[in-house]
Regions:
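Flexible, acidic/Gly-rich N-terminal and inter-domain linker regions that tether
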Residues: 1-83
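Canonical Radical SAM [4Fe-4S] cluster-binding loop centered on the CxxxCxxC motif
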Residues: 78-115, 122
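Active-site glycine-rich loop that binds ribose-phosphate moieties when present
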Residues: 115-122, 147-152
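Short Fe-S-cluster ligation motifs
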Residues: 121-135
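Short helix-terminating capping/connector loops at secondary-structure junctions
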Residues: 125, 158-163
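Internal gly/pro-rich beta-alpha loop/helix module
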Residues: 140, 153
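Conserved, mostly hydrophobic/aromatic
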Residues: 167
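Conserved small/polar residues in nucleotide/adenosyl-binding loops
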Residues: 171-177
């Protein structure tokens, strides 16, 4: 296996069930996944903390503090049938769109797959749509984004349906010059 048992136990939200079972065995992986996804999350398994929540009638903005004291935001949009969560994939953003606050301080780092998944876990809400469009440019963190989607879709964990996951990316346009 390419991971150690300590890596799996220290950051379990960063691994699919298959990866876990290859490293720590099927029985322990099954028990750990049950603890992670079928019960309320326990602080010992989380690498980020909720620092602030701003609520309005139909939206909630969460500010999370990461282990390296950096901050990211996640937005939950309430709907009659559950909710949509807008998830960050980076700390800061390298694109610098003029309409976006995230890029004003520049790019700091990519989020790990675990940090992406934990944004959804920490909401403790019924989420039926995930949009990767919070802080950062999702496709600039492609490997961790794809791994997070695999973890979210894992049938032993959240078993999130594919049709409820969307990414939003910028399009680079070259405008004609005069």
């Amino acid at each position: 296996p390419k991971y150690t048992p300590a890596e799996v136990r220290n950051d379990p939200y960063g691994f699919t069930y298959k990866e876990m079972s290859e490293v720590i065995g099927e029985n322990e992986a099954k028990a750990l996944y049950e603890e992670l996804y079928k019960q309320l999350p326990r602080k010992k398994n989380l690498s980020m903390l909720v620092k602030n929540i701003c609520k309005s009638s139909d939206t909630e903005k969460y500010v999370y503090e990461l282990k390296d004291n950096k901050y990211i935001e996640t937005v939950f949009i309430k709907r009659r049938d559950g909710g949509t969560v807008c998830v960050s994939t980076q700390v800061g953003c390298p694109v610098g769109c003029i309409f976006c606050e995230s890029g004003r301080n520049g790019f700091v780092r990519n989020l790990t797959s675990s940090e992406i998944v934990q944004q959804i876990i920490l909401l403790r809400r019924k989420v039926n749509r995930i949009v990767f469009m919070g802080m950062g440019e999702p496709l600039f963190n492609y490997d961790n984004l794809i791994k997070a989607i695999h973890i979210l879709r894992d049938r032993y964990g959240l078993n999130f349906p594919t049709d409820g996951i969307t990414t939003v990316s910028y399009t680079h346009l070259t405008l004609p010059t005069k």
